[in-house]
A protein has these predicted regions:
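Short, charged, solvent-exposed linker or helix-capping segments at domain edges/interfaces
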Residues: 21-26, 89-91, 103, 149-150
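Short aromatic/hydrophobic contact patches that present stacked aromatics
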Residues: 12, 26-28, 76, 140, ...
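Face-selective signature of the C-terminal outer-membrane beta-barrel domain
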Residues: 82, 86-96, 117-240
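Transmembrane beta-barrel wall of Gram-negative outer-membrane proteins
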Residues: 31-60, 65-99, 113-134, 184-185, ...
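N-terminal periplasmic accessory domains that precede
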Residues: 1, 5-28, 39-42
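Exposed loop/turn and edge beta-strand positions of beta-sandwich/beta-sheet ligand-binding modules
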Residues: 7, 21-23, 37, 73, ...
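One face of beta-strands
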Residues: 25-27, 52-54, 102, 135, ...
């Protein structure tokens, strides 16, 4: 495979389940203009009631202008196990880190506009399905870490000077969700559930030069919790 275009953002990994028993491993690599490289390796396993997908990738490009480099590292894993015909458990994790530079416009170029960003997510779910009733208990956690240099314009007549600080932020979101749904009679569906979510984050500037080198200047630090319960009753009119 040869890719002639440069990368513009995070690459999302889309996985497909393996139906037959066994182990399969795939690897892809592509190289194109602007020193663009795309690589990915994936391993899939189905053995009895156990399934797994593990994937890793590395992508990079110099971009079509100076100070426009981009590189991304990614890893993904998904595990599943069928406890019985009615119960199964699944877990997955996905982590991506990328380094990127922003050169500004052609008429007003910038220098040192660099960012390093890491984002990830993980989840665990236990599901049941008895035909007339089904449900799940799910837990998830998402997080992010950002380190950004806003950079400066290189025009000597501009007063926008190199920054003596770096912007930092950290955010996360976690939650627990449970529901159970039952079909009491034809055309009817009753669902009972509850959710808990917590999300928040903090942002600050870290000084890297000058008299304040090493100091931290806080910008924001907030979090919020939400709890909800629900009962949903549905009936198809005219169902016999």
């Amino acid at each position: 495979d040869v890719c002639s275009s440069d990368l513009g953002g995070v690459v999302n990994i889309v996985t497909r389940g393996m139906r037959e028993q066994g182990v399969k491993t795939y690897a892809d690599i592509g190289y194109g203009s602007y020193n663009t490289l795309q690589t990915e390796a994936t391993n899939r396993i189905r053995k009895g009631r156990f399934t797994s997908v593990v994937s890793g990738s590395y992508n990079r490009t110099d971009g079509h202008r100076a100070d426009m480099g981009f590189e991304q590292y990614g890893g993904y894993a998904k595990l599943g196990y069928e406890i019985s015909q009615a119960w199964n458990v699944r877990a997955d994790v996905n982590v991506t880190h990328f380094n990127a530079s922003q050169p500004g416009t052609v008429t007003n170029p910038m220098a040192d506009a660099d960012q390093r960003i890491t984002r990830g997510m993980t989840s665990l779910s236990v599901e049941n399905n008895y035909g007339r009733t089904s449900g799940a208990l799910s837990l998830f956690y998402n997080w992010g870490r950002h380190r950004i240099n806003d950079g400066y314009t290189v025009d000597p007549n501009d007063t926008n000077n190199p920054k003596d600080y770096r912007f930092n932020s950290r955010d996360d979101m976690m939650g627990v969700s449970w529901y159970q749904s039952a079909r009491l009679f034809r055309g009817n569906r009753l669902t009972v559930g509850a959710d808990y979510y917590r999300f928040g984050g903090e942002a600050w500037n870290r000084y890297v030069e000058g008299d304040r080198k090493g100091e931290r200047s806080d910008i924001a630090d907030k979090s919020q919790d939400e709890v909800a319960g629900y009962v949903d009753f549905r009936q198809d009119i005219g169902a016999g």
